Amino acid sequence: MSLFRTYVRVLSYLNQEKNAFLLICTANITLAIITIAEPILFGHVIDTIADKSDTLVTLAVWMCFGISNIIAYVLVARGADRLAHRCRLTVLEKSFARIISMPLIWHQQRGTSHALHTLLRATDSMSSIWLEFMRQHLSTFVALFVLVPVTFKMNWRLSIVLMVLAILYILIARLVMQKTKNGQAAVEHYHHNLFKHITDSISNVSIVQSYNRITEETSALHQHTNNLLSAQTPVLNWWALASGLNRMASTISIVCVLLLGAFFVIKGQLSVGEVVTFVGFSQLMIGRLDQISGFINLAVSSQAKLQEFFDMEDSTFQTNEPANLPSLPNVKGAIQFHHVTYEFPNSSQGVFDISFEVKAGQTVAIVGPTGAGKTTLINLLQRVYDPTVGYISIDGININSINRESLRKALATVFQDAGLFDRTIRDNISIGKTGATDEELYEATKTASAHDFILKKSKNYDTLVGERGSQLSGGERQRLAIARAILKNAPILILDEATSALDVETEIRVKNAIDCISQNRTTFIIAHRLSTIRNADLVLFLDQGRLIEKGSFQELINKDGHFYKLLKRGGLTINQPATKEKDDNIIPLRKAMAL
């Protein structure tokens, strides 16, 4: 995207407050035209002094004009500041809403820190450009448009000096833009790397300290800052050179105007006041040209980050689903995978030709070694990814033909990572159901064996859990996540190692709760516990992305196939009595898979 198109697109965001924007633009244009009269009035003051005539009236008019101009500029600048800040926050809110609504694959491809950094830096740059446009850019272009014919009317020979000056500014700016284009893109790249490293290190500060990586992480940051400075220094040098060349050109131009003006005064072709007026025009033009140079500097330095933002914005619009997609009606929970294949880009991993059917209310245990495709299968159901071949249906409806919002309403997921916000316990659980009553909240936490430990906290349900639940134990975090899913009361429940962080006693209670809420509800469990697999209606055994075996627990045992051999390698006794003591003894299937 060219610099001009980038600039126009940035300004297009001001259309959201069109009336205020047009009012400020009109005031700016008026000010720009009126500003040109100031050197003319000052020239008249000089002429009245030279003629020894009454200067009081002319001087008073000039002073009043100058003061009024200052007041008007302050009012316009105030309005521009407010409008720019309002628009910045509006763009931030709308972009944020689009970003968090994107599929998870979109975020995984870009990275959280990259999207955050792009959004914040771009909105800051847009705010600066809006401010400069409403304060200076528009009035500068208008002033130059009016100033050129006025100066030519006064004295075309002196005007040529100013035209040469303008051409020099343009040539210098063009040269610097060409020299810094690639450098500015590199600067933005290193900015992202720097921000990514800081975010990554701070978010994993416990690992950094545990493995005594403070010196190494600081050294790596130092390398990132050196890379940034190495890329930024040449860019800054070029703009410093441009500033010096512009200043030299403007000084030479003023000297030429004064010398030529003095020559014309001696010849009687100009008065002293007219020369002063023309010098004022020269200074006004130099000031406007300096503003244009500053604007070009701002636009060029912002282009790379704005281009990234626009690419991100465009990708959100392209990824957006059609507005007229229907919703899932009265979900019962019958799910079917129809020859589903998904392969990760630039990888041979994924899932391949998966077909199975789950009746409404059944519990499905997904089993397999690490990297077998268990989580990928669940992600396809949640439309984190869309199949490259085949499709998935809920109650006979292709989930690609419905809107994502209704699909998400039908699913309640408990991940291995509880995923808590830095908010209160109440807020974190209430995410499951907006507007839930206290009674519903308490019932959910009691079912998840969370109510008792919550009451022991300093502020009970109003206790802050810290960033990602850092103020809670692993088991406490997991129970809150389960309570959140219980509160949502969705017809389809997904548990990704949901009880892996719990002690045996708590796991028994939570397992009973899960068994309770699984009644009349389709449940998918990524299973690593033998007790979970035994109780499932359907067991899916995956390996290397393929569905190797499926059936009930006993059916797979009777097959004497891969699943049975896996259990046997783990040294587990299959035909032991299913007493409560034995059934609730948590035997890690993961151990068998590792053998």
From Swiss-Prot:
Gene Ontology MF annotations: ABC-type beta-glucan transporter activity; ABC-type oligopeptide transporter activity; ATP binding; ATP hydrolysis activity
Main subcellular location: membrane
Keyword Iron-sulfur: no
Start and end residues of each ABC transporter domain: 335-569
Transmembrane intervals: 21-41, 56-76, 129-149, 158-178, 252-272
Boundaries of every ABC transmembrane type-1 domain copy: 21-301
Protein name per Swiss-Prot or TrEMBL: Beta-(1-->2)glucan export ATP-binding/permease protein NdvA
Organism expressing this protein natively: Bartonella bacilliformis
Origin organism lineage: Bacteria, Pseudomonadati, Pseudomonadota, Alphaproteobacteria, Hyphomicrobiales
